[in-house]
Structures are given as structure tokens and as C-alpha cells.
């Protein structure tokens, strides 16, 4: 009789483990209770998540948001399984982190991007640029490249072919007015606006400087730009959990019209909902081309 009971318990445990690991997705105890634990940066990520809480609650999910003030721990706590997801980073940062730290994090969905903009300093229009004027840009690799690409898109400079999202000042091929590019830490760029012709800022620093992207920028990245697609801020999860019910619910709400409206109204262009329709269109086109090639081969 005792042996029969032990077999029953063992069978129950085995079935439970099988259910928890079905399709390679490990469901945490918190997920069973309807709780989604997310690590996030304060602005705008945690603010957006707070707006999503009541919507998720209506769907039966409790959203537990913890704010982190660094860019390392949010990934480590997701890798360890202590948190279900994080919301603070873009894809290049995630890829680099995985490579350097040996983690296994993946993109579960793009939510927003923070567009770079060119803002007035001592000059109001790019047409007012004169020989030897100075433009201030961030000096870190990622943000400097975005700034230089934006200047190129607006006819200020020309970069070498292929420079792309790794461009530096050394890649400037044409500079008709010999504009001086002053490289500063990102947080310092807006502080020299009274000393230079223009400053090039990311959305969050534009907000801190009192700029409105939609009203004050002379030019800014668009939602279909290479930079927007590359530097979209994402929900990141441990590999294998991207298709879990909880994560899909979270991403769906963050991409809903309610959250898009909140982002547009609150951040006035400094934070923009990511529109992946163009990306999907590109993917569909690529698939159609592949099918056409297959038919031709047949």
C-alpha cells in the first residue's frame, strides 16, 4: 500500500514537472499566480509600465515593477529567473551584454524608441550654419553614430559608405563648411547650447533640457529610420520564455492603443511608440522574394 502511494506521488510530481516545462518554457510560481515581475529604468520605462498595470489587471495579471538605476542588474535578475522580464534597453546593448556576460536573454517585443533630434543653440536654422561653426554631439559610440547620421540626413556632413551605426567623426568624408563636431558626455551636451550653433540630443536628455521634440527640434529621427528600428527599447526575457502567456500579455498591452496614446500625450515626441509595421512589411517582402525565387527554380 505504501509503495502504491509513493508511486502515485511520484507520478503526480512527474506530470507537474512535465506541465511546467512543456515546449521548453519554464513557468515560475509567480506566473501561476498571475504575477509578472519586471525590472525597469525609472523614466520612461517604469512610468509606462505603471500605466499598463490596470489594463493587465483587467486581464487577470498583476504587474510587479521594480526600478533599477543601473544597466547590469536588470539583465542579471532576468537571467537568474528572479524576474520575468526587463524593460530598459535596446537590441545592440542586449546583444553585447549576452556576448560579454554569457547570458541568454532575447527580445520579446519592441515597445518604444527615443528619437535623436537637432536642437537650436546660437543658431535657429541649419541654413544659418557658417564656416567653422560648432555642433555638440554625445561622445559614446552608439549615440555619436546616431547624431552623425542625423546630421548627414540633413545635409550638414557626408559619411563614408558603410559607416552606418558605428560611425565616428573619423568617418566624416565631406564637411563643406568645416563644421567642428564637439564630442561630450551625453548628459553634458545640452549644457553647452549657449556656446555652440546646435546640439544633437537623445529624447530623454531633450526632456531634461526642457525641449519638446515635436516643437523645438529642427530635425529628428523618424519611426521608419534605421536608427529607430535598431535602437527600439524592448521587453527582454530569458530565452525560452518569449512565447509564454504572461510575456505575450505584457507585450500586447504595451503595444496597445491605450499605451501608445499615453506615450504620445505624456512625452510629446521625446518618446515614441515603436511602429513595427514597416519592419513586418520588409519581412513579408523578403518572404515573397524567397517564394518567387523558389518558384523560378522549380
Question: Can you name each region flagged by the protein language model?
Answer:
Residues 19-33, 298:
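Sec-dependent signal peptide cleavage junction
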Residues 32-43, 61-67, 133-135:
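Short, well-ordered beta-strand elements
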Residues 65-76, 164-191:
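Short helix-initiation/N-cap motifs at beta->coil->alpha
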Residues 79-89, 133, 156, 177-180, ...:
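Alpha-to-beta junction loops
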Residues 96-108, 121-123, 195, 200, ...:
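Ligand-binding "clamshell"
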Residues 108-157:
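A conserved helix-loop-strand patch within extracytoplasmic ligand-binding domains
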Residues 115-126, 231-244:
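A bilobed periplasmic-binding-protein/Venus flytrap-type ligand-binding module shared by bacterial periplasmic
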Residues 145-152, 254-274:
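Periplasmic-binding protein-like
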Amino acid at each position: 500500500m505504501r509503495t502504491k502511494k509513493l508511486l502515485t506521488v511520484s507520478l503526480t510530481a512527474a506530470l507537474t514537472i512535465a506541465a511546467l516545462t512543456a515546449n521548453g518554457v519554464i513557468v515560475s510560481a509567480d506566473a501561476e499566480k498571475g504575477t509578472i515581475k519586471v525590472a525597469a529604468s525609472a523614466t520612461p520605462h517604469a512610468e509606462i509600465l505603471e500605466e499598463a498595470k490596470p489594463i493587465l489587471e483587467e486581464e487577470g495579471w498583476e504587474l510587479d515593477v521594480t526600478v533599477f538605476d543601473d544597466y547590469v542588474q536588470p539583465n542579471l535578475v532576468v537571467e537568474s529567473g528572479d524576474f520575468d522580464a526587463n524593460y530598459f534597453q535596446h537590441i545592440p546593448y542586449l546583444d553585447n551584454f549576452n556576448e560579454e556576460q554569457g547570458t541568454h536573454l532575447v527580445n520579446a517585443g519592441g515597445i518604444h524608441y527615443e528619437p535623436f533630434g537637432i536642437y537650436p543653440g546660437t543658431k535657429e536654422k541649419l541654413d544659418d550654419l557658417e564656416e567653422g561653426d560648432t555642433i555638440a554631439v554625445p561622445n559614446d559610440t552608439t549615440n555619436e553614430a546616431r547624431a552623425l547620421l542625423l546630421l548627414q540626413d540633413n545635409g550638414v556632413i557626408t559619411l563614408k559608405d558603410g559607416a552606418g551605426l558605428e560611425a565616428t567623426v573619423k568617418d566624416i568624408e565631406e564637411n563643406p563648411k568645416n563644421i567642428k563636431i564637439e564630442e561630450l558626455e551625453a548628459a553634458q551636451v545640452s549644457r553647452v547650447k549657449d556656446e555652440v550653433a546646435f546640439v544633437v540630443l537623445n529624447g530623454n536628455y531633450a526632456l531634461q533640457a526642457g525641449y519638446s521634440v515635436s516643437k523645438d527640434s529642427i530635425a529628428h529621427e523618424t519611426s521608419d529610420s534605421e536608427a529607430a528600428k535598431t535602437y527600439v527599447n524592448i521587453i527582454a526575457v530569458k530565452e525560452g520564455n518569449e512565447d509564454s502567456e504572461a510575456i505575450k500579455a505584457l507585450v500586447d498591452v504595451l503595444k496597445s492603443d491605450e499605451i501608445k496614446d499615453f506615450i504620445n500625450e505624456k512625452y510629446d515626441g521625446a518618446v515614441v511608440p515603436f511602429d513595427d509595421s514597416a519592419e513586418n512589411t520588409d519581412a513579408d517582402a523578403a518572404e515573397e522574394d524567397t517564394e518567387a525565387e523558389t518558384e523560378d527554380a522549380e
